[in-house]
């Protein structure tokens, strides 16, 4: 607690802020889904550190044709829950950011939001704000779209798991890299998506370096 005291960092939320955070419905209403672009049937996954507890961004991937893909970057739509001038909004404004210490995280928002409602956990429907691109393997963008969406994350990966598949060029995650500690095989279409995304990222990086 010494660092928290030294820098005047708040480590507990006022009870009225926690009450407001606990008042939200967990289930997303059909009306809300109707007002959003639906990506629940598009392959979607998160890639984060092994120790991550909140997953605030996800990738979706769909092959459209031989050399054309739809790639989505989805960010948790916190604004759906944290409305202007509410107690939650004021508390988040005061905190400004989440603080990551060696042994703990001091979150900007109560855990029911940061680790639950706004965390893009696997096998759960979540509200997001998205940037979606139609792109080829070279990284050329043909179409772009931005807006509110609903997603369903199919998989949660750690960086080490994805790196293992990329380096081995196989859909196998070795036990030493696995989140579960046991070796497992990823479905072929998921492995192909990871390979394609890696290839696009490499081409974009090379392009940037030339400039």
Enumerate the predicted regions with their spans:
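Electropositive polyanion-binding surfaces
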Residues: 1-211
């Amino acid at each position: 607690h010494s660092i928290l005291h030294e820098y005047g960092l708040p480590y507990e939320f006022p009870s009225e802020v926690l009450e407001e955070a606990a008042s939200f419905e967990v289930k997303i209403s059909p009306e809300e889904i109707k007002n959003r672009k639906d990506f629940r049937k598009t392959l979607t996954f998160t890639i984060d550190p092994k120790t991550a507890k909140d997953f605030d961004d996800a990738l979706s991937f769909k092959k459209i044709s031989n050399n054309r893909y739809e790639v989505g970057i989805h960010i948790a739509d916190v604004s759906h829950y944290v409305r202007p001038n509410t107690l939650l909004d004021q508390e988040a404004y005061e905190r400004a950011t989440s603080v990551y210490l060696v042994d703990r995280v001091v979150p900007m928002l109560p855990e029911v939001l940061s680790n639950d409602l706004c965390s893009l956990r696997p096998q759960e429907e979540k509200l997001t704000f998205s940037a979606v691109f139609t792109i080829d393997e070279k990284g050329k963008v043909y179409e772009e779209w931005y807006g509110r969406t609903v997603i369903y994350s199919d998989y949660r990966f750690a960086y080490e798991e994805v790196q293992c598949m990329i380096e081995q060029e196989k859909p196998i995650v070795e036990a030493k890299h696995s989140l579960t500690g046991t070796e497992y095989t990823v479905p072929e279409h998921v492995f192909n998506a990871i390979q394609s995304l890696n290839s696009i990222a490499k081409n974009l990086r090379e392009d940037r370096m030339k400039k």
